Curated annotation (Swiss-Prot):
It catalyses: dimethylallyl diphosphate + AMP = N(6)-(dimethylallyl)adenosine 5'-phosphate + diphosphate. Transfers dimethylallyl groups to AMP as part of the biosynthesis of cytokinin phytohormones. This is Adenylate dimethylallyltransferase. Its EC number is 2.5.1.27.
Length: 240
């Protein structure tokens, strides 16, 4: 079975690469993103819209309300193995994402050592200026998406349930938006009515939070097996 693995830090174009590869191969994309398993966080987690998918198929490891919390890495890994097994007869899958904990589960599991031909695309972290330009553009799009709720509207809606607030505080983007509101002594719904200067500061702050996360991803990701090549058969990370 052919597995095409696309991974790297946030804001490095993994989803676009996956969509292009899905168009080329006809294979579905399975998201290796635990936060994207919550549809209530669609915009803030970077779930691509129907238009962005361009007719390709995208699968998620779960479909859960936020009140259940973010799916644990171990459970996500079990779901991942199950999905790969289910699609074995279809000839292949594209795996795309950047969950440190999920990729580490893969690196520590012998399941990935046999019966797979690996095609690995590793997206690297760009220099700070390039990254920030891309991240700011992404945040602007999240504030005014072509479809669905904005990241702030998602936050406002979910903030109404106090039991969800601790979960939101653990997620990039939402966390900084809450901090920004607190620092400026405004309520979360007032984030929907910021003037241009304040909005620019919010955008910059969220992008900075993404940069911090991207640097952590770059440091913590498991290393690709030194023996790997296109069509390589063996463990993609050499096991840790």
């Amino acid at each position: 079975m052919d597995l095409r693995l696309i991974f790297g830090p946030t804001c490095t174009g993994k989803t676009s690469t996956a969509v292009a590869l899905a168009q080329q191969t006809g294979l579905p994309v399975l998201s290796l993103d635990r936060v994207q398993c919550c549809p209530q966080l669609s915009t803030g987690s970077g779930r691509p819209t129907v238009e962005e998918l361009k007719g390709t198929s995208r699968l998620y490891l779960d479909d859960r309300p936020l009140v259940k919390g973010i799916i644990a890495a171990k459970q996500a890994h079990e779901r991942l193995m199950g999905e790969v097994y289910n699609y074995e007869a279809h000839g292949g899958l594209i795996l795309e994402g950047g969950s440190i904990s999920l990729l580490k589960c893969m690196a520590q599991s012998s399941y990935w050592s046999a019966d797979f031909r690996w095609h690995i695309i590793r997206h690297e972290l760009a220099d700070e200026e390039t990254f920030m330009n891309v991240a700011k553009a992404r945040v602007k799009q999240m504030l005014r998406p072509a479809a669905g709720l904005s990241i702030i509207q998602e936050l406002v809606d979910l903030w109404k349930e106090p039991r969800l607030r601790p979960i939101l505080k653990e997620i990039d983007g939402y966390r900084y938006a809450m901090l920004f509101a607190s620092q400026n002594q405004i309520t979360s719904d007032m984030l929907l009515q910021l003037d241009a200067d304040m909005e620019d500061k919010l955008i910059h702050g969220i992008a900075q939070e993404y940069l911090i996360h991207a640097r952590r991803q770059e440091q913590k990701f498991p290393r690709v097996n030194a023996a790997a090549y296109d069509g390589f058969e063996g463990h993609p990370f050499g096991m840790y």
